[in-house]
Amino acid sequence: MSTESMIRDVELAEEELAKKAGGPQGSRRCLCLSLFSFLLVAGATTLFCLLHFGVIGPQREEQLPNAFQSINPLAQTLRSSSRTPSDKPVAHVVANPQAEGQLQWLSGRANALLANGVKLTDNQLVVPLDGLYLIYSQVLFKGQGCPSTHVLLTHTISRLAVSYPSKVNLLSAIKSPCHTESPEQAEAKPWYEPIYLGGVFQLEKGDQLSAEINQPNYLDFAESGQVYFGIIAL
C-alpha cells in the first residue's frame, strides 16, 4: 500500500467520524482520532523511507565485505611483517670451554649466531653497517676460598673504530669476591661472581668490538650459556 492511499483512507475515515459525531464531545473525539491517525501515518511513512533507502534493516551481501576493507590491510601487514625475516645485523657468540687460560669466542654453536653481515675476526665482532647497536656481554667467575691477597675481577667491552686508531673502552666493571678481614673467615668456601655489561652505542661500518677479562682462570664453564657476547642493530 502506498503512502498516498494510506492518507486518503485516513481522510475518508475522518469525514465519516465527523458526520456521526455530534456536539462538543464528538468534536473532541474526532480531534483525538485525527491526531492519532496523523502520527500513525507519519510513523509509517518514516519507516517506509528508512527501509527503502537501506538506513535500517539487514545489510546487502555485496556491502558486507566493504565493512572490513579498513581492517584487512592492517591484518595483512601484521601477518606479512611477522613472516618477513629481519635483515638487521645481529650476533651472539659464546665462550669456548676448551680454551684454557683465555676467553675465546665461538660462533659455530647451537646457542650462537652471526647474521646479516656481522663477522667474528681475531676474537672480535666486526660491525657491517653504520647505526645504533645494543652491545652486551656476561661472564661468570668462580673460585674456592680467598687467597691472602684480594682478587680483582674485571670485564671490559672495547671498541676499535675505523675513524680513530686507538682502542676505547665502552663498558667496564670490576668486582672483588673476597671481603673477609681475617684468615679464620676466609674458609675454603666456593664463591661466584657474575658481571653483566650492556649499553647502546652509535657504531660505524668496520668497527671492531672485543669483550675481555683479566682473570680467565676463574671463568666458570660448568653450564652452557653463562659466558657470552653479542650485538643487536636497533
Swiss-Prot record:
Glycosylation sites: 81
Intrachain S-S bonds: 146-178
Organism name: Equus caballus (Horse)
Positions carrying Phosphoserine: 2
GO term, biological process aspect, one: regulation of secretion
Cytoplasmic side stretches: 1-35
Subunit relationships: Homotrimer. Interacts with SPPL2B.
Protein name: Tumor necrosis factor
Pfam family, one: TNF
Domain THD: 89-234
GO molecular function per UniProt: cytokine activity; tumor necrosis factor receptor binding
